[in-house]
């Protein structure tokens, strides 16, 4: 399912917070992998595959400061063993409020309806 799912229009997404060795048995079932900030260098290879840390995926060096490290990850695709550093857009709560305020239409006064 994880390797052929795209052909029929579905995908399997799995997430974990503790990349210990007990997940190694299923890790290879997922052809594409994403690793965000990790605690230890050894965890990088546990998530992205053997040698990923040596090929540049320094996930333990991603900053815990949201202004610097939010959304930063390393991606390893099935077709390429070399991890790529990516960053998803980071939207603050203030940004969301400003967008919502900008999209709210002007209030319309509705006439009273007799009951």
Each model region followed by its residue ranges:
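Conserved catalytic/switch belt of AAA+ P-loop NTPases
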Residues: 1-7
């Amino acid at each position: 399912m994880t390797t052929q799912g795209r052909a029929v229009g579905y995908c399997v997404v799995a997430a974990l917070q503790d990349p210990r060795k007990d997940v190694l048995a299923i890790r290879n079932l997922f052809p594409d992998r994403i690793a965000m900030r990790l605690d230890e260098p050894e965890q990088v290879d546990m998530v992205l595959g053997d040698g990923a840390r040596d090929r540049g995926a320094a996930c333990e060096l991603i900053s815990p400061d949201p202004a610097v490290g939010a959304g930063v990850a390393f991606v390893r695709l099935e077709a390429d063993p070399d991890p790529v550093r990516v960053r998803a857009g980071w939207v603050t709560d203030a940004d969301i409020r400003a967008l919502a305020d900008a999209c709210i239409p002007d209030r319309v006064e509705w006439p009273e309806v007799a009951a």
